[in-house]
Structures are given as structure tokens and as C-alpha cells.
């Protein structure tokens, strides 16, 4: 099952709009909407908000088109929002690194040292880096899947492994459930930041393949 894409925050949208304008003054609202993954009307509303706050100015270019330009105030705001974004990113990195380290320490103590990561992206890369500090072997990083059959196909070629660690930032619950169905609850884990809720007893029983 495909889950809805997480909506960006207000600051993220403003940063995206300012960045798009800085890169290309002749950028269209439609292209900004496509790039940010938001509705066209929302882009229009944020452009007007940026205009009213003096973050951008508008100029006309032929033929009957408009160009947007960052004002000095807009450049300052873009720098501030960028710094905030990076700080948030660093906070994510620190939290992910700490939680992966604690999880791998626990798994190593249980003798589960060869792991398959399920779900690519930033969290998977952080997990792979942290694994080296705990003598954990990563069998591979598989794409996330919301069903056991798809997950089985994605794990093909990994060879034997002791456990799955879910690292998917999207479809986390669905992927976790599929992994439990495939291996059983005692061989499936996820960092706490994914906030995967406990499974019902029937689902947690799994097939234990």
C-alpha cells in the first residue's frame, strides 16, 4: 500500500520557494509546485506571502512573463532557514546515530551480528556507518515493501542473516509488519525514532521462516 507523502512544513516551503527563485528568476509556479510536491495554489499563496514580507520582488520580462528576485531581506531569510534546516538535519543524525548504536549493541549481545537493513535513505546510511563500531555485518540494504512477498524478493541474494532492522523513513509500520510476517517478531527491529507502534499478538507471531 502506498502511503501519502509527508507534507513539508511552512519553513520548508518558504525555503524551497526562495531557493527556486534564487536559482532561476524566471521559474514558473508550476515547476516550483512539482519540485516541492505541493499544490499549485499553495505555491501561489506562498509567493504572495513572500512578496508581502519583502522577501522577493517581481519584475516583468517579455513576453508577458514575470521574473522573481530575492531581496536582501529575502537572502537573509533564506540563510536563516537554511541554517535551521541543517541544524534539524544534524539533530536527526545525532538521534539516529545514538539509537542505531544502542540497537546494535543489544543485537550484538544477542548474537545477532549479520543484519539486513530494509529501507534505503539517510537512516540506512547512518546505520551502515554505525555498524562498523559494533562489529555488525550488514548483509545489504533492501528496498522497503509493505508485503512479505515483496520483501522476500527484495532480500534475494543477501544470503543468511540473523535479523532485519527497518530503516525506512516512509512506510515504516507497513514494512515492519511485513518483516515480522516473514521472520517473526524476535528477528525484526527498528530504531525508536521511527515510532513503529507495537503489533497485535496475531501479527507479531509471524511465519518465522
Question: What is each stretch, according to the model?
Answer:
Residues 1-15:
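Short alpha-helical segments that sit at the start of domains
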Residues 2-3, 56-58:
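N-terminal-biased segments
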Residues 12-26:
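Short amphipathic alpha-helical interface segments
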Residues 22, 30, 35-55, 61-209:
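Hydrophobic, well-ordered beta-alpha structural blocks that scaffold small-molecule cofactor pockets
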